[in-house]
Amino acid sequence: MVSEKTMAERVLALMGRPNNIRNIGIIAHIHHGKTTLTDNLLAGAGMLSEELAGDAMFTWWHEQEREREMTIYGAAVSMVHEYEGDDYLINLIDTPGHVEFGGEVTRAVRAIDGAVVVVDFVDGIMPQTETVLKQALREYVKPVLFINKVDRAIKELQLPPNKIMERLAEIVVGVNDLIERYAPEEFKDKWKVSVQNGTVAFGSALHNWALSVPYMQKTGIGFKQIAEIYNTAADAKEIRRRVWEIAPLYRVVLDMVVRHLPSPKEAQKYRVPKLWHGDLNSKYGKAMLEADPNGPAVAVVTKVIVDKTSKQETAIARVWSGTIRRGMEVWLLNANKKVRLQQVGVFKGIQKIQIEEAKAGNIIAISGVRDLQSGETIVEPEPDGSKPNIPPFEAIKHIFDPVVTKAIEPKDPRDLPKLIEVLKLIQKEDPTLKVEIDQESGQILISGLGDLHLEIVEYRIKNDFKVDIITSNPIVVYRESVKGQAGPVEGKSPNKLNKFYITVEKMPDELYWKLREKLLKGELPEGKIKKMNEDIIKHLMSLGFTREEAQRCKVIYRENMFFDMTRGIIHIGEVIDMVMDAFMQVMDHGPIAWEPCIGLIVKLTDAQLHEDAIHRGPGQVIPAVREAIKLAMKDAGLVLYEPVQVILVDVPPDYIGDVTALINSRRGAILDIQTEEDRALIKAKVPVREMIGFTDTLRSATSGRGVWYLVDQVYEPVPRELFDQIVREIRQRKGLPLDADIV
Ligand SMILES: Nc1nc2c(ncn2[C@@H]2O[C@H](COP(=O)(O)OP(=O)(O)OP(=O)(O)O)[C@@H](O)[C@H]2O)c(=O)[nH]1
């Protein structure tokens, strides 16, 4: 009906109609067909030529993605879809399926309100289906389901229709189990998917068709006609042409998106209170709840893309309220600076078009601004130009910590500045990657979620940014903790004029998991608690602390807590900040081998301070407190934890024996084995130390037919017989004394 208008005009017109916008993502286990689906949706919505879809893989930006056949870097695309006589703007953020890139998924879900969960008909629900759906639900993203690759049921497996229906029903039940488990309480029922109400569609992204109950009812087209085409068509090309005429994928899937996924106006009402902890009655709170284009502008950056040739940075951001205009000055709340937005764009298909302004509810591309980080909150200044006094959006949390580190250096030392610049850029795109300079050795250390993650980073440095590098073997990151409790232990300052008394205890497991969850959700702050408030006290009390203890909590750092339990000590206020610094230093570098600590409760119970401030400076206080914490930890019984990955290995059943042997040889344990006709799913637990190179070994042990996925990551104590060896290795590497009890 509006075809005379150009696509760009249609996109621009829709940007001002938040009820007609859908910000969505496609989430799925690796290789379940997201990219193929995205291409076909784009093609259907007239953004790509139909011929290319499925082959061109337009969302594959990076060469190595093609090489590895995985989508690593999510891209943003937009399309226009007509539904019941009206236009809708669909902004789609592609998300990677491989869990080593889980950080990408987490960031992408922040920008979207709804998700199409893609499940492979044959594979069924796989580990990443669960991980990504969990992440989406945690951020209040509503799901609908698309069951893909149904063509295989018809052609390859030749299943009769009743078997196909049974299998579809099984997948729906499985997805609903996950929704029951992970959806927020108030949406557990409302968000269940159902074939009857049209929140489930199924089809073939490869052949470009889909069906849903509403579509079947509206058109009278059913599974019979589709099966008929498969049975009579000469080749895949003919199948595509004929199914396109009766049940084009984009129409069925995008109808489902428009009909069942929320507009920004609807979604922001319940998402803003969860993702932003400011005052909902302030002008910012009100404007965001309503996605009000006339309120103050607030936007959140969910991704930064760096062009490898021009090195220009483009930030993808979601506008939550107000109107972002080209050339406007804004505050970056985390970076704490004011910048001018040089260029603002939106997507038309995969192309960026420059625009003058974007209203609340839209996804935009900002270029020409340095220092924009993923997670940054952008706010319009107060009328007098000052920084608005509102909290930033909650930091974007990642479920897995980096556990593998490599030292990296340029082949040619003159490339060092270039390497540092490149690492900064890559880290901007991928904040799950950690880059540090080792204080002692001066080495550059990069840490990631596994050796595959780091391999991809190395590939980008060499091929995209053309810096030749040398890297060390991967090093595993351990954690230090204690078995029991100890103290008060005395720590004396070097001048012997100040004394601090410290107790240390292991955090009970239940408390640890609850604390971790609260940190992930952003309900408790990380770092020094600058201003204690009722909200923090309430959350601490729900962890089991008394009101008084809660009020005395000073720092929550790396999943450890510090409390000041002293009473009436004169001058304590002048040194407490240094005491907190000392606590954080030990949590960064524990006494066993300078690895980070977890799960500790550290309390300052008493102190004797010299009355003259000259004698109680940082040089006196910090070493005294550090020593007291380390000695107390030693008395409480030191424990070294190693990261352990729970993995799922997918192999033909003939290889169960080989894989079991492989896992046993790597200090692993088999947790579960499920066999189906032509595959076995082996769930196992393997220390990360033994996972290095696992992919290649698995491949050769299974003639290339085995793959594995990361399901979970936990820490477990290193076995007694390995403790000395591992501690020695780490200390040697770090140049620490080998024979000392503690370092
Ligand atoms: N038979 C069949 N194969 C499909 C279908 N959809 C996708 N595929 C194939 O499945 C493989 C993975 O498809 P992709 O679209 O790359 O999957 P993806 O989920 O984007 O994969 P990653 O980006 O690697 O996570 C490719 O070989 C596709 O050709 C389908 O409907 N039927």
Curated annotation (Swiss-Prot):
Entry annotated with the keyword Zinc: no
One GO location term (cellular component): ribonucleoprotein complex
Residue positions where Diphthamide is found in the record: H615
Subcellular localization: Cytoplasm
Keyword Cytoplasm: yes
GO molecular function: GTP binding; GTPase activity; translation elongation factor activity
Keywords of the record: Cytoplasm, Elongation factor, GTP-binding, Nucleotide-binding, Protein biosynthesis
PROSITE patterns assigned to the protein according to its UniProt record, in alphabetical order: G_TR_2
Residues at which GTP binds: 28-35, 94-98, 148-151
InterPro entries listed in its UniProt record: EFG_II, EFG_III/V, EFG_V-like, EFTu-like_2, P-loop_NTPase, Ribosomal_Su5_D2-typ_SF, Ribsml_uS5_D2-typ_fold_subgr, Small_GTP-bd
Sequence ranges assigned to domain tr-type G in this UniProt record: 19-265
Similarity section: Belongs to the TRAFAC class translation factor GTPase superfamily. Classic translation factor GTPase family. EF-G/EF-2 subfamily.
NCBIfam families according to UniProt: aEF-2 (TIGR00490), small_GTP (TIGR00231)
Record HAMAP family: EF_G_EF_2_A (MF_00054_A)
Described purpose of this protein according to its UniProt entry: Catalyzes the GTP-dependent ribosomal translocation step during translation elongation. During this step, the ribosome changes from the pre-translocational (PRE) to the post-translocational (POST) state as the newly formed A-site-bound peptidyl-tRNA and P-site-bound deacylated tRNA move to the P and E sites, respectively. Catalyzes the coordinated movement of the two tRNA molecules, the mRNA and conformational changes in the ribosome.
Name the record gives this protein: Elongation factor 2
Taxonomic lineage from the root: Archaea, Nanobdellota, Candidatus Nanoarchaeia, Nanoarchaeales, Nanoarchaeaceae
